[in-house]
């Protein structure tokens, strides 16, 4: 019986901790959500521009190398 409890107890503890975590978590309010969304959009835009300019620079360099 002790061996069974040794296997069951970690699962029970994990379930208890998980339930406590979910109860403690709260959804962000509108202001916080908009702040996160704007920051994410700015990050996407910056990464897009970086990728665009890298591609813009590498196309002529690639044409010079391959065109020779």
Curated annotation (Swiss-Prot):
List GO BP terms, alphabetically.
post-translational protein targeting to membrane, translocation
Chief localization class? Answer: endoplasmic reticulum
Q: Name one GO molecular function term.
A: ribosome binding
Alphabetic keyword roster: Endoplasmic reticulum, Membrane, Protein transport, Translocation, Transmembrane, Transmembrane helix, Transport
Location in the cell reads:
Endoplasmic reticulum membrane
Q: Which PROSITE patterns match?
A: SECE_SEC61G
* Residue intervals annotated with topology Cytoplasmic: 1-32
Its record classes its membrane topology as: Single-pass membrane protein
- One short Pfam name that applies is SecE
Transmembrane stretches, by residue range?
A: 33-61
One Gene Ontology cellular component term attached to this UniProt record is:
Ssh1 translocon complex
Which residues lie toward the Extracellular compartment? 62-68
Q: Which family does it belong to?
A: Belongs to the SecE/SEC61-gamma family.
Partners and quaternary state? Heterotrimeric complex composed of SEC61-alpha, SEC61-beta and SEC61-gamma. Component of the ribosome-associated ER translocon complex.
Report the function annotation for this chain.
Necessary for protein translocation in the endoplasmic reticulum and multi-pass membrane protein biogenesis.
This chain's protein is named: Protein transport protein Sec61 subunit gamma
């Amino acid at each position: 019986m002790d061996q069974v409890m040794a296997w069951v107890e970690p699962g029970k503890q994990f379930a208890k901790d998980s339930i406590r975590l979910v109860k403690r978590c709260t959804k962000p309010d509108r202001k916080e959500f908009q702040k996160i969304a704007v920051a994410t959009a700015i990050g996407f835009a910056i990464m897009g521009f970086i990728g665009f300019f890298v591609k813009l620079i590498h196309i002529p360099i690639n044409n010079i190398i391959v065109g020779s």
